[in-house]
């Protein structure tokens, strides 16, 4: 049964005497740090020497320290740096300076779940993961609202890890919308699956395939772009607002009939079987192992495939058409 927690379930007072170090000042880092500070908590920012975010964090009113120094000063350490560098930074700048009773916080479980970070037994480990990009986490907080979040406890040395996690979630505004209890395993595996099979890998491959089929059949690339990529936002926005039902109530009956009859032919049982294979690769750690090795080898496959897609016809056509729609960036 799902457990959801709200403001009334969280005690911000548990953090009032704590020093919180937010490591990283990117999308989530800047939002979480500012929300915590505006909630009246003691927050410092930890960054690598020479970070381009150093001056930005200072201009936002934070005391900024090198990562290792921030860890030394903190009771609660939120690790908001990219997955692929977390393990190295942990070994060099976090682990040597951890003290008994500290709490390590994450917003994604990759490195804990796949054993790339193995903290000592005498610290708390929990996750608070807002389910929105950082700019929205910040904007909703400023509007007196919040975005939903996830909470997971991996290690409860203090006996209060869950309570500390809920307090942290309240500090960044998530308990206003609701915080769902999960595990590091569930968050990590479902997050990776969603990215690979649906949100990123699935969608980009579907869009490219549709575009290519139309162009190969002799249709103008610009028309193919509008039909297969540009209008995608309109449909996704409707689904975001009210699920499949609102989307289908908002499109023509012709479009809905095509949706119902043709959709299952495209995403058929073979596709679901492939999705199951992808999920098994995630669950077994095979994907994590490949990604870790790819980074150690300086990303040859990652860079080659990224470059290939950046030079795809759909990108060239898209740039030209987006230049005709200046309101997109308003």
Curated annotation (Swiss-Prot):
TM region(s), chain numbering: none
Recorded GO CC terms: cytosol
Positions with a binding annotation for Mg(2+) 2: 191, 227, 231
GO biological process, one term: L-valine biosynthetic process
Pfam families the record matches: KARI_C, KARI_N
Enzyme class: oxidoreductase
Binding site for NADP(+): 25-28, 48, 51, 53, 83-86, 134
Cofactor: Mg(2+)
Domain KARI C-terminal knotted: 183-328
GO MF annotations in UniProt: ketol-acid reductoisomerase activity; magnesium ion binding; NADP binding
Key words of the record: Amino-acid biosynthesis, Branched-chain amino acid biosynthesis, Magnesium, Metal-binding, NADP, Oxidoreductase
Chain sites annotated for binding substrate: 252
Cofactor note: Binds 2 magnesium ions per subunit.
EC number: 1.1.1.86
UniProt-annotated binding residues for Mg(2+) 1: 191, 195
InterPro entries recorded: 6-PGluconate_DH-like_C_sf, KARI, KARI_C, KARI_N, KARI_prok, NAD(P)-bd_dom_sf
Catalytic activity: (2R)-2,3-dihydroxy-3-methylbutanoate + NADP(+) = (2S)-2-acetolactate + NADPH + H(+); (2R,3R)-2,3-dihydroxy-3-methylpentanoate + NADP(+) = (S)-2-ethyl-2-hydroxy-3-oxobutanoate + NADPH + H(+)
Active site positions, chain numbering: 108
Associated pathway: Amino-acid biosynthesis; L-isoleucine biosynthesis; L-isoleucine from 2-oxobutanoate: step 2/4; Amino-acid biosynthesis; L-valine biosynthesis; L-valine from pyruvate: step 2/4
Top-level taxonomic group: Bacteria
Domain KARI N-terminal Rossmann as annotated: residue spans: 2-182
Stated role: Involved in the biosynthesis of branched-chain amino acids (BCAA). Catalyzes an alkyl-migration followed by a ketol-acid reduction of (S)-2-acetolactate (S2AL) to yield (R)-2,3-dihydroxy-isovalerate. In the isomerase reaction, S2AL is rearranged via a Mg-dependent methyl migration to produce 3-hydroxy-3-methyl-2-ketobutyrate (HMKB). In the reductase reaction, this 2-ketoacid undergoes a metal-dependent reduction by NADPH to yield (R)-2,3-dihydroxy-isovalerate.
Family, as annotated: Belongs to the ketol-acid reductoisomerase family.
Protein name: Ketol-acid reductoisomerase (NADP(+))
Species per Swiss-Prot/TrEMBL record: Halothermothrix orenii (strain H 168 / OCM 544 / DSM 9562)
Organism taxonomic ancestry: Bacteria, Bacillati, Bacillota, Clostridia, Halanaerobiales
């Amino acid at each position: 049964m799902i457990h959801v927690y709200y403001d009334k379930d969280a005690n911000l007072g548990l953090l009032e005497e704590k020093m919180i170090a937010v490591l990283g000042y990117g999308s989530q880092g800047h939002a979480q740090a500012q929300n915590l500070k505006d909630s009246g908590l003691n927050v410092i920012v930890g960054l690598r020497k020479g970070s381009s975010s150093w001056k930005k964090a200072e201009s936002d009113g934070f005391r900024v320290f090198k990562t290792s120094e921030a860890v030394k000063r903190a009771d609660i350490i939120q690790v908001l740096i990219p997955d692929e560098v977390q393990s190295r930074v942990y070994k060099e700048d976090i682990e040597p300076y951890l003290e008994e009773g500290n709490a390590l916080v994450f917003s994604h479980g990759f490195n804990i779940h796949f054993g790339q970070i193995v903290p000592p037994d005498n610290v708390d480990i929990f996750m608070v993961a807002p389910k929105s990009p950082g700019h929205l986490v910040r904007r909703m907080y400023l509007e007196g609202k919040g975005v939903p979040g996830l909470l997971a406890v991996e290690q409860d040395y203090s006996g209060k890890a869950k309570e500390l996690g809920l307090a942290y979630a309240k500090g960044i505004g998530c308990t206003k919308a609701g915080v769902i209890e999960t595990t590091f395993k569930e968050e990590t595996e479902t997050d990776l699956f969603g990215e690979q099979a649906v949100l990123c890998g699935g969608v980009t491959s579907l869009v490219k395939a549709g575009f290519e089929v139309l162009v190969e059949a002799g249709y103008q690339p610009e028309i193919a772009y509008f039909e297969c990529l540009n209008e995608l936002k309109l449909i996704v926005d409707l689904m975001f607002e009210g699920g499949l039902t609102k989307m289908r109530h908002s499109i023509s009956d012709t479009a809905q009939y095509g949706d119902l009859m043709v959709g299952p032919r495209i995403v058929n049982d073979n596709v679901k079987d492939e999705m199951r294979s992808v999920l098994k690769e995630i669950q077994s750690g095979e994907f994590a192992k490949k990604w870790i090795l790819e980074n150690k080898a300086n990303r040859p496959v990652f860079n080659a495939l990224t470059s290939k897609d950046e030079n795809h016809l759909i990108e060239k056509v898209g740039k030209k058409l987006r230049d005709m729609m200046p309101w997109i960036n308003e």
